[in-house]
Amino acid sequence: MDRRLLLSALLFIALACSSNRVHGALNRHSFPEGFLFGTGTSAYQYEGAVDKRGQNIWDTFSRIPGKIADGSNADIANDFYHRYKEDLNLITAMNMDSFRFSIAWSRILPNGTISGGINKEGVEFYNSLINEVIAKGLKPFVTIFHFDTPQALEDKYGGFLSENIVKDYVDYADLCFSLFGDRVKLWNTFNEPTIFCMNGYATGIMAPGRCSPYASASCAAGGDSGREPYVAGHHLLVAHAEAVRLYRARYRAAHGGEVGITQVSHWFEPYDAGSAADRRARRRALDFMLGWFMHPVAHGEYPPAMRRLVGGRLPAFTAEQSEMLRGSFDFIGLNYYTSNYAVAAPPPNKLHPSYLTDNWVNATGYRNSIPIGPPAYTPIFFNYPPGLRELLLYVKRRYNNPTIYITENGTDEANNSTIPISEALKDETRIGFHYKHLQFVHKAIQEGVKVKGYFTWTFMDCFEFGDGFKDRFGLIYVDRATLARFRKKSSYWFADFLRR
């Protein structure tokens, strides 16, 4: 027997035997009928096969020395492009209901536009993937854009800094709806626009790597940290609204699907609960992180705090755009990883404006040197399950109780090549993380929040953008040298938790 197969078989036996339910009575049947349990991926982080698509901004960014923590790239990634059929078997083995993945814009349209040509091989790949997902008894949950702007459009007009992106994105979304919408019933226009705009245009630590010189000397692409994040976000919101309007007019009646947008937010607690200034800071922190993209799709305008503090650097919606944005979702995706304390900050330096300081808030994970929750491997993340319930209740109150899918929740550990794989698979911390968060999701549902699903991040260890492969979020371990897959203990725990 192949040594890797033998090792995998032995690990299967050991971990399966130790995967008995280690927590209380909560399980799949505790949640409402039809509740979706799933796991997620994204195209650039998983697919590989870079030679079979057009270039995107991450292909360019990852080749700039120093931009990726471990110097890696995602040319091969997890080679999901060639291994998806066997990989989907791992998802069904965990008794999941749904698989969340994204379509690579440049794999469908290598030059970013319809006129630039459609890649038939790319279309065939996604058709085959969707068909296989359904054949496995899984519901496809598809993201149209997950940070990977075609490089051709970045070169042509600056990507999301130009209003030209709106038409090209809507054309691309239209093509996706027409090609795959007969089988895909859950569409997500954009993933985490806050992260895309903040780190792509304010800090420069993610593609396209733009920021002001005073924000970072390493932003060789140039930029304006006080203006460009808002410009890119504005065009993204208009593109989202146009795509939703098109779907509702052209496809919804025939396909019967739904379209949403995935937001991301920390929960924030006031550093000093007795301080009115810190309580106001908590509200501003939520407005700038969640409200930036949630308020427009719910109310047709930016949060009042953003309009007041950002002023003329924040673009204004036309009356038509505002009307189009208002209610432009059937559901909200919500990604949650951590909570912070919000501390009222003094007015920022007017000569150095930045999205990062416009909210007049200092966020920290520590109060009196005590963390808000156990720190994860990624230093900005803290394990604080009550924060997810608080965030869900906040969205319910502030935004008229929308339908919510928790589209990402997860924790990581270091990619430590010095320990045996058999030890790396023992991820008890991840089991406790998900169980405790699911307890608070269950509680929020009992309190009237319309949560319809919970997706782990991530299905298997993958390229984590600026961190490269140095951390592992997956339920499945990937050996970077061989790309062999090994089930972690958490994957067996989910199989037990989700037993039908």
Swiss-Prot record:
> Which E.C. number(s) belong to this protein?
3.2.1.21
Gene3D superfamilies annotated for this entry?
Answer: Glycosidases
Give GO MF terms, alphabetically: beta-D-fucosidase activity; beta-galactosidase activity; beta-glucosidase activity
Q: Which gene encodes it?
A: BGLU28
Alphabetical keyword list: Disulfide bond, Glycoprotein, Glycosidase, Hydrolase, Signal
Q: Which reaction is the catalytic activity of this chain?
A: Hydrolysis of terminal, non-reducing beta-D-glucosyl residues with release of beta-D-glucose
Enzyme type, top EC level: hydrolase
InterPro entries attached to this UniProt entry: Glyco_hydro_1, Glyco_hydro_1_N_CS, Glycoside_hydrolase_SF
Keyword Hydrolase in record: yes
Q: For binding a beta-D-glucoside, which residues are annotated in this chain's numbering?
A: 45, 146, 191-192, 337, 408, 457, 464-465, 473
What's a GO biological-process term for it?
carbohydrate metabolic process
Catalytic residues?
192 (proton donor), 408 (nucleophile)
Q: Which cysteines are joined by disulfide bonds?
A: 211-219
Glycosylation sites noted in the Swiss-Prot or TrEMBL record: 111, 362, 409, 415-416
Q: Which PROSITE patterns match?
A: GLYCOSYL_HYDROL_F1_2
Q: Which family does it belong to?
A: Belongs to the glycosyl hydrolase 1 family.
Query: Mind telling me what this protein is named?
Result: Beta-glucosidase 28
The secretion signal range is 1-24
